[in-house]
Amino acid sequence: MLRHITFTVFITTSMNTLATGMVPETSVLLVDEKRGEASINIKNTDDHPSLLYTTIVDLPESNKSIRLIPTQPVIRVEAGQVQQVRFLLQATVPLQSEELKRVTFEGIPPKDDKSSRVTVSIRQDLPVLIHPASLPEERETWKFLEWRKNGDQIEISNPSNYVVRMTLQFKTLPSGKTGAINKTYFLPHTSTTTALTNATDTKVEFYPASRYGYRGNKYVTDLK
């Protein structure tokens, strides 16, 4: 019996990623509240047409009252063609701090009941950064992070109105001991704790991520 089977491959695009299928033009979707909308170009790099499915995904900490709605959640994209996907921002009150969500783009190839081949659908997963109209632009958001000793733990907090993104690992200085956090982002006014490996260290070294998810130069700050 002839069978046609489709598998989905899930790709998180946060740094430089090479991929096939439906490929976004950038590694992050930036949304400005002033405009009330955003758009991104998606290219179908396959040699066949596919249906492009666009889905906004809330993080566990996301503000569910802030909604970003794709105007065309499902659309056919021909082979080699570029499709612009537009999003509308909906919020009940003006935003005071940045919001982080995710968006997935998945290309579903046409079904051929007479074929026995196995096809693979690629799902791209990008961060969505929503910036309030009243908040000044800030490129170096990581400088707002506060690192404090608390017993045998380090408490890392983000008291700012900005989303901060960084790599998972960091070092405490001068010992050079390595530590790690459990996620690569800090939403505004959130904090986390991790193990303190050397109580005498007074500095922290880590690598922040740019707005587009690229790893920046190392940054050193106080461990209080």
Curated annotation (Swiss-Prot):
GO biological process annotation, one example: cell wall organization
Pfam families given in the database record: PapD_N
Leader sequence residues: 1-19
Localization (cell): Periplasm
GO MF term set: protein folding chaperone
GO annotation, cellular component aspect: outer membrane-bounded periplasmic space
InterPro entries according to UniProt: Ig-like_fold, PapD-like_sf, Periplasmic_pilus_chap, Pili_assmbl_chap_C_dom_sf, Pili_assmbl_chaperone_N
The keyword tRNA processing belongs to this UniProt entry's keyword annotation: no
Protein keywords: Chaperone, Fimbrium biogenesis, Immunoglobulin domain, Periplasm, Signal
Transmembrane segments: none
Role according to the record: Could be required for the biogenesis of a putative fimbria.
Family: Belongs to the periplasmic pilus chaperone family.
Protein name: Uncharacterized fimbrial chaperone YhcA
Gene behind this protein: yhcA
